């Protein structure tokens, strides 16, 4: 019972693991660690995706970054930053070989004469920039990045900083971008608080896993740790990267620039608060196979590309569909990944500002002592259950309720921002992607769900983004407010990032002040 692709596969000969975000089995939310170590089960191979001739250097380096994300499993905020830095380094190196584009850090100071603006020089420059960047961010994976360089017939040990050579330009721009990003508020170096990417804001939850003090606020959950398929040990969640609102954005002035108004509150807007909880129970009780497969497809948990990487795979599809040049992909991935960076900052600003309750806590509180109609668990369908027993449709096997506050939805924010960029770059909302599941191929209810072949279709980028956000309501980890305000925030972020990216492409320095 294999999954199969439709439209999205016909444009690519890459292995399935490197195309369009296969959702993967997620066994734990793995709370507490901002950057997780390794996948919970051993992999047969850690090889990078096979490099095919039709994949330009931008796609090859994007795949290298995505493979690192799949294996190292950084949280979505960290993964988005990782992708943005990688593609910013490539863009800044490429800008030296364009007649008008300016780099983010060095402007037009490294611009080379027209006779040097060859395809090969661009490949060399962006590859050294990507290599230095990736090696800095994930030095433990340098052997994999060496393999990509070798495949491009480049010597990764060449440390030249000669600005008259593409190698030197690549290394120089990587130095400049990394120096800036080492001090961007993410705490990559652990110099603001001990431990890379650790919290330095002294965040402490109001509620504990076993005591609910404020029903409007986030409650960390006690979650099982996978142990050979048996669940006998537990961890208590910690807010993942609560400091992220302090990270320097690309296009926004600050992380709070597009902060939405507060979500529904039990103490201030009880009717709307209760209604949204009831809506989730109704969705849970009436889940269709199509909706269940939407949940699984968009899960994007710790052993996949995460939501930011998922949209990079959509961009790879666009590159193939529209027959992109190297120049096209440098610019598209630069704008896309920086929108994902800013989307993460904006979403986590709202999460930190409102510290809002997750549905599982709210539903257990609101309907305590009552029987509710809802999804009853794996293979059980809809049942009447105690409200305190209600769980999202992805508990344990898929990504359990994530380790950070609810409002706003990261999926919704990331996806809406990415869709805005792809719409702007292609000058059209047309997407044309789809993904099919064979009967019984569910990772969660294998053999039962879906009962017949299901195909998810996205005629537009907007439709894909909306489905990503809605999927989090179907599974029960986000309220309507968290989804819709996340979409709105993401669209604002995407438009702002595109405005700045386009100014950089066109060398309009006067428009770059934010």
Residue ranges and their predicted role:
Residues 30-36:
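Signal peptide processing junction and immediate N-terminal pro/mature segment
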Residues 36-514:
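Acidic/polar surface patches and capping/hinge elements
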Residues 1-14:
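N-terminal secretory signal peptides that target proteins for export/translocation
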Residues 18-29:
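Bacterial N-terminal signal peptides
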Residues 15-18, 415:
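Alpha-helical and His/Cys-centered functional microenvironments
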């Amino acid at each position: 019972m294999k999954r199969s692709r439709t439209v999205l596969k016909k444009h690519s000969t890459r292995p399935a693991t490197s195309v369009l975000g296969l959702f993967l089995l997620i066994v734990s939310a793995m709370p507490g660690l901002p950057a997780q170590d390794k996948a919970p089960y051993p992999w047969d191979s850690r090889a990078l995706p096979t490099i095919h001739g039709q994949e330009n250097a931008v796609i090859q380096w994007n795949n290298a970054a995505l493979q690192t994300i799949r294996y190292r499993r950084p949280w979505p905020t960290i993964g988005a930053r990782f992708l943005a830095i990688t593609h910013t380094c490539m863009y800044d190196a490429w800008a030296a070989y364009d007649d008008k584009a300016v780099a983010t850090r060095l402007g037009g100071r490294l611009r080379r004469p027209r006779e040097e603006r060859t395809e090969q020089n661009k490949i060399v420059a962006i590859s050294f920039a990507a290599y230095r960047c990736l090696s800095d961010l994930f030095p433990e994976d340098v052997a994999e990045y060496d393999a990509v360089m070798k495949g491009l017939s480049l010597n990764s040990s060449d440390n030249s900083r000669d600005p008259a050579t593409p190698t030197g330009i690549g290394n120089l721009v990587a130095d400049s971008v990394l120096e800036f990003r080492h001090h961007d508020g993410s705490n990559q170096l652990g110099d603001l608080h001990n431990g890379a990417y650790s919290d330095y804001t002294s965040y402490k939850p109001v509620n504990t896993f076993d005591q609910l003090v404020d029903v409007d606020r986030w409650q960390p959950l006690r979650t099982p740790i996978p142990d050979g398929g048996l669940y006998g040990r537990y961890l208590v969640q910690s807010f993942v990267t609560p400091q992220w609102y302090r990270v320097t954005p690309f296009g926004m002035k600050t992380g709070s620039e597009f902060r939405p108004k507060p979500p529904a509150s039990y103490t201030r807007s009880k009717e709307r608060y209760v209604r949204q909880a009831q809506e989730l129970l109704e969705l849970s009780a009436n889940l269709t196979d199509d909706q269940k497969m939407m949940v699984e497809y968009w899960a994007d948990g710790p052993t996949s590309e995460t939501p930011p990487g998922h949209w990079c795979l959509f961009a790879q599809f666009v590159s193939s569909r529209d027959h992109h040049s190297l120049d096209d992909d440098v610019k598209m991935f630069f704008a896309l990944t920086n929108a994902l960076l800013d989307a993460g900052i904006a979403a986590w600003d709202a999460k930190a500002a409102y510290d809002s309750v997750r549905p599982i806590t709210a539903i257990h509180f609101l309907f305590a002592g009552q029987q509710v109609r809802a999804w009853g668990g794996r293979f059980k369908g809809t049942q009447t259950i105690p409200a305190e027993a209600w769980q999202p449709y992805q508990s344990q096997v898929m990504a359990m309720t994530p380790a950070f506050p609810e409002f706003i939805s990261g999926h919704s924010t990331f996806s809406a921002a990415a869709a805005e960029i792809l719409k702007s770059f292609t000058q059209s909302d047309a997407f044309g992607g789809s993904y099919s599941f064979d009967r019984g191929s569910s990772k969660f209810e294998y053999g039962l769900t879906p009962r017949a072949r299901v195909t998810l279709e996205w005629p537009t980028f907007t439709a894909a983004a909306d489905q990503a956000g809605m999927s989090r309501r179907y599974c029960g980890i986000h309220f309507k407010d968290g989804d819709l305000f996340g979409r709105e925030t993401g669209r604002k972020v995407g438009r702002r990032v595109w405005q700045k990216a386009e100014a950089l492409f066109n060398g309009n320095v006067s428009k770059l002040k934010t």
